Amino acid sequence: MAPAWSFLLALLLLSCNAICSLGCHLPHTHSLPNRRVLTLLRQLRRVSPSSCLQDRNDFAFPQEALGGSQLQKAQAISVLHEVTQHTFQLFSTEGSATTWDESLLDKLHAALDQQLTDLQACLRQEEGLRGAPLLKEGSSLAVRKYFHRLTLYLQEKRHSPCAWEVVRAEVMRAFSSSTNLQEKFRRKD
């Protein structure tokens, strides 16, 4: 009987250790892949931004959703997930497939998919700790509206190379802001 209890206790301790080691450390798990996405987005550039100056547009980037002073780490994870998910969807459209280098686009999809997987694990963990959804509806809505404006702009411009260049630069801006947000939490930790 004693060996059975010893075995169960050892198994319980090992399970606890494995579960506890799955902690979500946003700045550490997300920053490097985020930089990878930025690098890939930079490499996608096909058109000189200066040749697309007439196509520039103010998409009203929701800076407050990514940089508000009241944003907590758990909410930041939700915002980052939302930005990553919409970026994945945007660069998975038929129009993007005809615009960008297929190999780079595949790498971008893989990097974004990995980020989504990591962020979803963090979301589940944080929601489990708090017992409630993390994202304030206002932040989620602001991010969704921002990406909707990008999509409408692409449709309006008929997915022209310059329109995609403008959108690529905008998405890089969103990812740069999320990197800054991560750095803010890294300094706090």
Swiss-Prot record:
SMART domains: IFabd
Keyword set includes Iron: no
Leader peptide range in chain numbering: 1-23
InterPro entries: 4_helix_cytokine-like_core, Interferon_alpha/beta/delta
CDD domains: IFab
Cysteine disulfide partners in this protein: 24-122, 52-162
Keywords noted in UniProt: Antiviral defense, Cytokine, Disulfide bond, Secreted, Signal
Record's function text: Produced by macrophages, IFN-alpha have antiviral activities. Interferon stimulates the production of two enzymes: a protein kinase and an oligoadenylate synthetase.
Name assigned to this protein: Interferon alpha-B
Naturally occurring in which organism (per UniProt): Bos taurus
Gene (name only): IFNAB
